[in-house]
Design a protein with these regions (language model features):
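C-terminal non-catalytic regions of proteins with extracellular/luminal or membrane-system context
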Residues: 1-208
Length: 208
């Protein structure tokens, strides 16, 4: 039914969700309730499909190559609908960037599967965090893994240039400066990202 409706539409916007909470962990990174199958069917029927994700963390996107756009809205609150609509209709530039890494598969994670169930006393288990400080994007960088979307990733309706990068070290403090300029035709905000590493590579996860 969704596929037939999508085929008869000019474009389709699919809202997909994933519920997480302090006392409710997700069993895996797939969208629940067969939402991946729904998105796949809709995108197959209409290539002009956009997906809005309302999730609490990273999810897998097996349908990514078949859709025209993906907007990660997280849990946007009571005014989320208005904000999402303004972004989708181009009234405001999507200037945000990912604060986490979206893996291409669960196998890229340092611990894809946890054996046991912490909610059941007889199935509780200990976890040895052998990855140390190499968590999040630092794990992917350390292992040379290419994620689906890296930490700091974000698209925009405009473009930006960065010039005049300079670094100055004095009194134990590093100061970095450069100029960022909006070179496109749409008003927007650019997020400057600077990554530093030990020149001797002594730390277990090199960039931060």
């Amino acid at each position: 039914a969704a596929g037939r409706l999508a085929a008869a539409s000019d474009l389709v916007i699919v809202f997909a969700h994933q519920w997480t909470a302090e006392a409710f962990d997700v069993p895996n990174l797939s969208l629940p309730d067969n939402q991946d199958a729904l998105i796949t069917a809709v995108a197959k029927a209409n290539p002009h499909t956009a997906v809005v994700l309302e999730t609490g963390g990273a999810v897998l996107m097996p349908w990514l190559k078949d859709v025209g756009a993906v907007l990660e809205a997280w849990y946007p609150g009571t005014s989320g609908g208005e904000a999402i609509g303004r972004v989708l209709f181009g009234e405001v530039n999507p200037s945000g960037h990912l604060p986490i890494t979206f893996p291409a598969s669960e196998q890229q994670l340092p611990r894809p599967v946890l054996d046991g169930d912490p909610k059941k006393p007889e199935l509780r288990f200990d976890v040895n965090y052998s990855e140390g400080a190499a968590v999040g994007y630092k794990w992917f960088d350390l292992k040379g893994l290419k994620p689906l979307f890296p930490f700091g990733y974000g698209l925009s309706y405009t473009s930006f240039s960065h010039d005049g990068l300079a670094a100055h070290w004095a009194d134990g403090q590093l100061t970095v400066s450069f100029t960022i300029k909006n070179t496109g035709a749409v008003a927007g905000k650019g997020l400057a990202q600077v990554y530093v590493a030990s020149p001797k590579g002594l730390w277990e996860a090199p960039k931060r």
